[in-house]
Amino acid sequence: MKRKVTPREHPLYLKAFRAYIQYVNSGLYFRKEHVVGLENVPVNGTPVVLVANHQNCLNDPLCVCLQLTDRRMNFLARANVFKNPIANKALRAMGLLPAYRMGYEHFSEVSKKNQETLGAACEALADGETVMLYPEAGHQDKRWLGVFKLGYLRIAFAAAEKMEFKQDVMILPSCNHYSNYFHARTDMLIKFGKPISLMPYYERYQQAPRETMMEINKLVRNAIQEMMLHIDDLVHYEQIDFLRENGYGKKYAMEHGFNFNYLPSRLLSDQKLVDALQTATREHPEKMEEIYKDTSTFMEGLKKYNIRDWLFAKSPGVEAAALRGFALLALLPLYLLSIIPTGLLYLIPKIFLKKLIKDQMFVSTFNVAVSVFISVPLCLILPVVLLWVYLGFWWALGYFIAFPLMFILSWNYLRMFWKFVGACNFVRRKNRKGVRELKKLRKKIFNGLDSVLD
């Protein structure tokens, strides 16, 4: 007989705060969020351990939490963020639980505190809630999957034992994928795989717990690796990542029937291309080594002349660069109108980013956090309140509706400006010889890849 469960719900103020974060994260920061496999997520009330790759710090669990709004999510986070008493209370209210690590926390009482966290996670699962963990036990700075720890399975089986092995606990593999880790107005993707039932393993677990967990761990890791972009050739990682992200990746996607501009389709194309490149590296090491060397030279050339790969596909002339300049001048009044109310969204993170953030994978998290707690309150909430008080509801509503449009306009204008700068560098007289050499090298790389991959 199944144990009757009653999943907790977030209080109203936390639901309101989640809606606000969703406005900032999904409405302003990301251009588009894609979700694939939502039908694989077990219904609320089912004990679920959701596991995923971890590549973008807070954004990984945040985006999942904002998609699974039908349930209370519980996350394990590094214990150092719980040191402040106010933060400790707030984070626990939102479903975060502290995970103490020997390498980062004081050794004493670590085991005892982790047992408390384990008990809280088991209680949440026993109540039919969802617990999300990252088995790599830390974020990666590359698009690859690290070694999985067994902690998530220990929690899952401990919860099953708490329920006397009478109720199923599900492991839900998931993956996070980003078109760009560091920039706003880019796309992100969440994929949910088929859930893995632990009930068929209960009897074996009671006889041989570690062997059973290792077997399941392999299944879970393979499921996540198949969903994500996994580049395991770390020796040539930078070159492979550049090739799939730029002109050759777009060419490959189009030739193989994928949509390069639609992230779920582009991920499939990137997976296919990366597998082909890594296979070619094993089968034709000398040819691929030359291609990777040329790719490194090409990347250095782009950096030297401050240009991007897309310019070689467009090949703009002086006239095209001039037209971009005239377009920027024509749109300048609109940009100024849009940047005045939204400027702090750009300025405040820039002020503190270099001083506070040492790990580049925290950049996106920092930008979202600053927007939620500082920039958006100053740029949006405060003006809306003042307009409502002094000018009336309709002025406040108009500003609220116009604000995201102004932010998107200012962001796209800045993108146009930097593309204009790149086009100018591309056609500058003193750069022409170097650009011609890079163009030849790019063609050589493309031809070399076509001959090896076909």
Regions found by a protein language model. Name each.
Residues G151, E215, L328, L332:
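Short, well-structured alpha-helical interface segments that form or flank functional binding sites
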Residues M1-T6:
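Short, contiguous pre-domain boundary segments
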Residues P7-E211, V220, V318, L334-D454:
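Soluble catalytic domains of membrane acyltransferases
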Residues D275-K354:
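Membrane-proximal, non-transmembrane alpha-helical segments
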Residues E211, K218-L311:
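Long, charge-rich alpha-helical interaction segments
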